[in-house]
Each structure stands twice: as structure tokens, then as C-alpha cells.
Amino acid sequence: MKAMETQRNCRTLSLKEIILCTLVLGIIGIIKCEDNMWVTVYYGVPVWREADTTLFCASDAKAQNPEVHNVWASQACVSTNPNPEEIELTNVTEYFNAWENNMVEQMHEDIVNLWDQSVKPCVKLIPLCVTLNCSLFKCIKENGNTTNCTVQISTGNDSTANNITVGTIDMYNCSFNATTELRDRKKQVYSLFYRQDLEPLEGNKPPEGDKNALYRLYNCNTTAMTQACSKVSLEPIPIHYCAPAGFALLKCNDKNFTGIGQCKNVSTVHCTHGIRPVVSTQFLLNGTLEEKVTVLDRNVSNDMDTIIVKLNETVRLNCTRTGNNTIKGIPIGPSQIFYGIETVIGDTRQAFCQLNKTVWTNTFKKVRHALNETYKGYLGNETITFGPSTGGDLEVTNLHLICGGEFFYCNTSILFNTSIIFNETKDDNITIPCRIRQIVRLWQRVGRGIFLPPIRGTINCISNITGILFAQQKTDRMNKSAMFTPVGGEMRNNWRSELYKYKVVRIEPLGVAPTKAKRRTVHREKRAAVGLGALFLGFLGAAGSTMGAASLTLTVQARQLLSGIVQQQSNLLRAIEAQQHLLQLSVWGIKQLQARVLAVERYLKDQQLLGLWGCSGKLICTTSVPWNTTWTNKSYDDIWYNMTWMQWDKEVSNYTDVIYNLLEKAQTQQENNEKELLELDKWASLWNWFDITSWLWYIKIFIIIVGGLIGLRIVFALLSIVNRVRQGYSPLSFQTLIPARRDRDRPEEIEEGGGEPDNVRSIRLVSGFLALAWNDLRDLCLFLYHRLRDLLLIVLRTLELVGQTLLKGLRRGREALIHLRGILQYWGQELKTSAISLLDTTAIAVAEGTDRIIEIAQRFGRGILNIPRRIRQGLERALL
């Protein structure tokens, strides 16, 4: 009866009311869930992070050129890109630090490797570390006479030539004992050495006249000397440093950038400009120029730091060594030949460098002005002065450069003497004297020396001064002056002067951000790999755009991501194919392989993460991971319309690992759900139910059901026994007859048959396993049926009550709205009536007041007008 009553009550709900309830519940659910956001994966976002990676070089080297730089570059570098691309990054500010730039360290290692290969030693000069018996050598003139070797440098033009004596070059003729081809025999040989390459033994004085003195080679007691196989020219060629795929080079284009700080004009490039690895001290040679003289200093208050001054115009430096000499080979042991000077014709060590005085004076003024502007905040009113190098090795106290294969050591003190520079003379050029040494202390390592064989003939080279290296001496507070002196020796500063505008960054194409889209369904689809090509630099072009604008170009950015790998692979393969007879697994070969493998590994790692998250082949991938508001307090609009991807990456970088783990767990759960869903597909066809492969499974299920029923029967029996024992009665067996009540309309038995005392009868329990199982299964099904029916009725009754409650609420809401509308109409009418009454009253009062004012004015006017009449009437009466 209750069920029928419930069904009748359910029918009272009309279809219109049910639809209305459903809409109300849906609106409530939408209102509740509209603020939820979900993690969305983006592939191809313009995000980068600072990194240190292995760069590779590119150059236009020609393998057929025997010059050592060409040979090295042809083996170590790939070809340059004929169409280099540079992309401006708008609205991007990046921090640069030239003194913490790993690119400088990499270039330093590479140039050390270049020098080790270029100045490759062949003969150890340990046999020459013997006592040398030397006497002063006389130079041979053209007419055959001999005289002291004095260098006279001609300056000025031909009409006003001045011969300036720079000094006397001491050349010694030394004899020593050398081992012959037979190790047990020695012979005495001689060779010419220059004073700078010798050092006297203890207690010996330099030779005078025809007297002899004992010497040994310079650095024989401190370094391991070797002799180069052949004289090399060491003419540097431009080398470009390039970032491997997956990385990029950021370049600062600010005009006032001084090496450290924020840069607002940033661009991205694949390779640097061509850098000539010129080894020199005091001056930067053959580098790049700036728009104005720029001072690069790490810390203006630190006197120990080297100051790099970049020029805005070049100063031409012309270096020459005239004369001629004769070279001979001296055997110093089995298969060892020392190449020395046999004789000298002319002033063979007449070495000097010249530069234009006007150009140098103007440049010097600009340098002084730039230093004043840079250090005025630190030095105050102190005057900046200049002076010569304060001391140290010859490579530091002199301008050390390579000219035509010879090592020049030039005295530059005259260039920093303001009294000479600003003195107006007729000389057009400034000449600085130079020395040439053949035993040279190598700059790349401590305790290494090399003997370079002399070169015949005249040597001339032209270099461009593009920068100066200074050291700030301690300030003289008494004289209120600060002195700057030229310095050098740390070749990293030479490379830093060219690389200070660059930095290496690692591209991070994977990004996560909150959106309102959620992954709803679980389905399988055919996924295609994203095609990638073109140039990868455009990938960072949208770095300054907001996240919403940048996400619209993800397709193009993702296509550009892998192109760097493809282009680099093809370039390297072409280089290997063209130079396979030269390219071996050297240091640079290992670096190239590292760069290639690293790029591919990073790309595969990103693709692996996308696969773990179920986003393979997708540029924008929604997920079912809810966005946690604790990760950021930014609103949806602030994130997508006010922030760039770089800013967003810094905002959530601390939670990236957490988000990645949640994405992986969500995808694992989704795959499990998908697997279970697919396993149910085999039951979609009825024919599959009778598949022979399922019979064993059916048998297993049957055995489980039977075992369960038996176990259930045993449990119920035990429970029944326990229950009856607790009641004080225990049945004799499970086959005890149960009395059953007889129907009322059935007649009783006759007396002969024993009769029955009442209308009850006994029925025996079922016997047999199948009957018992069937009875239990029937009872179980009936039990489940009754329970499910009751549950359904309860649910229907609940829905009915909820519907009635909602309808009552809607009716009451409608009545409340009608009542509110009536109230508003009533009070609106009352307010309208009151306003009209107020306006009428005000109008009447104003009208009455106006009439009174007009009447008073009229009376007052008439009184004034009647004054003459009253006067006349008064006079008339008086006269009468």
C-alpha cells in the first residue's frame, strides 16, 4: 500500500515541473563550479633560463690554407651561416654579467688548444741548457764594415725625416759544446743570440769589447723549453661561437651597457659575431668598436680589477722589423737540430711600431673623458693621470704582440705620457721601440717556454687598436690624483671584451598554466607527431608578449623548436664528410658530439614528459588536475592578460615538480580507467558471450558462486544455531520438520486417520545439494529484489519531496516577488502622489509669495510716483 501510494504521489509531478527542477539543479552546479581552474600543459612557450653548456664554433676557414688558424678552424669548426638572423625581443629585460660568463672560459680553453696545436713543439732544448761562452757581436754593414748594432728609426715624411736613436741592440756570438750524432762525442759550435734571450751566470759581467762572458739561455732553470717545428705566422681569423639546439644566445644592445646590470634592448642570435683570437697585452687588437668609448669595470672601488676600455674608432698600429739574417741548423743530438742565427746583415733587430699622433691624441682624450665620467662618483674631484706599466713580466710591462711570426715587446710608456702626447710638434707619427725575443714565456700555462726559430727578411704587420686594458693604481690622496696604467697578461679579458654582450640560456618549451578547460572524456585517438622545421630563433620572438597572445602562436613556435637540431646535425655531417681525413676525436670532436647528444636528449626528455601526461603531439593539452590556489594568488585575468611567460615561469617555478607529479598520477589513473573501459568492450556483442575462450572463466565464476553460496549457507546455519542456543533450544538436526499452518477452507482428517488437533502441518526441509542451492539462490534474489524495490521507492519519494520542496520554494519566491512588486508599486504611487502634492504646494506658495512681492513693489512704486502730486497738493493748500 505504501508503494502504491508513493507511485501515485510521484505521478503528481508534471513533466514541466521535473524539467524546471533539473534546470535549477544544473544552474546551481554551474554556479558552484564556474570558479574552478585546471592545469593545462603548453608546449612551445617562450621561456628560458640561464645555463652553461658546450658551445661550438663556426668559421670560414679554408682547409687548403696552411696557416695554423685555418688548419685548426677547418678541423674544429663548422661553416658559418650565410644568412644570420637576429630577432629583437620587445618588452624584455635581462640581467647580464660579463665577469661571470662561462662563454669566456670556453673561449679561453679553445684558444689554449689552438696555441697548443699551432706552436707544436718538436725539439726539446734541454741540451742547450749549457754554459755559453759569449762575446759582443758586430753588425755587418753593406760595405762589409762592422760596428755596434744601433737601431735608428726614421720618422716624419721624406722632406723632414728625423732619425731617432732608440738604443743599441746587443747581439752576442756564443759558442758551446753540442752532442753530435754519436752521443759519446761532442763538438764546439756557435750561434748568435740576443741579449734578451740570455742571462749571465753568477759572478759574470756583460762582455766589453772583445772580452767573453759566461751565459745560459733565459728561463733554462725555471721552465721546460721546446723549439717549435717551424715558424708560424699566427694570423687569427674570425671565429663565431654558436649555441647548440635547445639553447640560445641573448645579446644586449644597450648603448650604455658597461658589462653588469639590466639590459632593456635584448635580442636573440644563434651565433656571436666573428671574434679574432688576438693574443696581446695592454692593447686590444683587431676587435669590434662601440658607438662611443665604453668602460667595462667589475667594481670601481676595487684597485685589483682590470679595466677594459672599448674605443669607438680604430688607431692604426704599423709594426716593422727590417734587415736580413742568415739561419743555420746546429745539430745538438741525434735527430735534433737547433735553428740559430749564423750572421746578421744590416740592423736585423730594427723593430718598431708607429701610429698617427693626431688620431691617438683624440682617442686618448676620449678615453680620459670616459674614465672621468665612470669614476667621478668614486674619485670625486681627484684628477685622473696616466703612467707606464708599474712592473712585472716583460709581457705585462710591454705591449706584447705577434707580428709576422715574431714576438714583439714594445715600450708604450711614450703613449701614456701626456706631456709628450699633447705637445704640438711637427711629427705626424708616434714611434715606439720594440724588442724581439725568441725565447718566449707562453701565456696559456705557467712554467712553459718555447724557442721560435728566426725568420729571414723584413717583417711588417698592421693592426687596429680597438681597446685598452688599464689597472687603477692606489689613489694619491695628497696630490688628489688617481693613476691608470696599462696592463695585460690575463687573456680572458681579451675575450671578455668581445663576449660581454652575450649570455647563454636554455630554452624551456614546456609550460603549465591554469585554465577553465578540463579533460572530460577518456577516448583513444590517433596521435601524429608535430612537424618541426624552419629556424629556431623565432621561437623566442613572442617572449615579451602576454601569455594569452603568445599562446596563439604555439604552433609556429613548436615547429621552430627542433630545427636547430636538424640544421646543426646537417652542418656537422657536411663538415665531417668534407674533412673526414682531418677530423679526429679530439677535444673539439668530443665537444661537438656532446652538443649534438645533449640537444637530442633534451628534446626526447620533453617528448617523454608529454607522453607521460597524455599530451603527445599536442600543443595545448587540458588535464583533469585541479589548479591549487596556493601555487599563486594571481587571478585568471592577471595571468593571461598582464603577465608574460617569463614572469609566469618565475611565479610558479617552485611548484613545477609538484605539478609534474600530479599530471603523471592523473594520466596513470586515466590510463587505468581507459584499460578497464576497453576490457568491457568484449561484452558488447552477444556472440562473444559464447566464445570458447571464456568457458574457463565461466567455470571459475560458477565455482566461486557455488562456494560462496555454500559458505553463506554454513554461516547462516551457524548463526541460527547460535541464536537458538541463546534462546535455550537447539534443534536435533537440520532436517527437523517445521509446522506449517493449514488453510482455513481445507477440511480436517477423519478420526480413523488420526485427526489433527488444529490447522497446522509439518513440511520437511529441502534435501539435496541442487535443491539447497536453488532455494538459497531464490531466497537471495527475492531478498535483493525487495531491498532494491524499497530503495527505488525511497529514492522516488525523496525526489518527490525534493521536487515539492523546490516547487514550494519557487511558489513562495514568486509570491514574494509579486508581493514585493505590489509594495514597490504602492510606495511608488505614494511617492509620486507626495511629490506631486509637494510640487503643487510649492508652486502655490511661490505664486502667492510672488503676488505679494509684486503688490508691495507696486505700492512702493505708486508711492514714489505720487510724491510730486502730494507736494503739488500741499502747495496748493498752502497758497489757498
Curated annotation (Swiss-Prot):
Region spans: V3: 319-352
This protein's name: Envelope glycoprotein gp160
V5: annotated span: 479-487
Chain segments annotated as coiled-coil in the UniProt record: 650-684
Covalent lipid adducts (S-palmitoyl cysteine), residues: 781
Domain commentary: Some of the most genetically diverse regions of the viral genome are present in Env. They are called variable regions 1 through 5 (V1 through V5). Coreceptor usage of gp120 is determined mainly by the primary structure of the third variable region (V3) in the outer domain of gp120. The sequence of V3 determines which coreceptor, CCR5 and/or CXCR4 (corresponding to R5/macrophage, X4/T cell and R5X4/T cell and macrophage tropism), is used to trigger the fusion potential of the Env complex, and hence which cells the virus can infect. Binding to CCR5 involves a region adjacent in addition to V3.
Region listing for MPER, in residue ranges: 679-700
Extracellular-side segments: 36-701
Annotated region (V1), positions in chain: 134-173
Site (Cleavage): 527-528
Motif (YXXL motif): 729-732
Record topology, Cytoplasmic segments: 723-880
Region ranges (V2): 174-220
Residue numbers covered by motif Di-leucine internalization motif: 879-880
GO cellular component: host cell endosome membrane; host cell plasma membrane; membrane; viral envelope; virion membrane
Transmembrane segments: 702-722
Gene Ontology biological process terms, A to Z: clathrin-dependent endocytosis of virus by host cell; fusion of virus membrane with host endosome membrane; fusion of virus membrane with host plasma membrane; positive regulation of plasma membrane raft polarization; positive regulation of receptor clustering; viral protein processing; virion attachment to host cell
Keywords: AIDS, Apoptosis, Clathrin-mediated endocytosis of virus by host, Cleavage on pair of basic residues, Coiled coil, Disulfide bond, Fusion of virus membrane with host endosomal membrane, Fusion of virus membrane with host membrane, Glycoprotein, Host cell membrane, Host endosome, Host membrane, Host-virus interaction, Lipoprotein, Membrane, Palmitate, Signal, Transmembrane, Transmembrane helix, Viral attachment to host cell, Viral envelope protein, Viral immunoevasion, Viral penetration into host cytoplasm, Virion, Virus endocytosis by host, Virus entry into host cell
CD4-binding loop, as annotated region: 389-399
Family membership: Belongs to the HIV-1 env protein family.
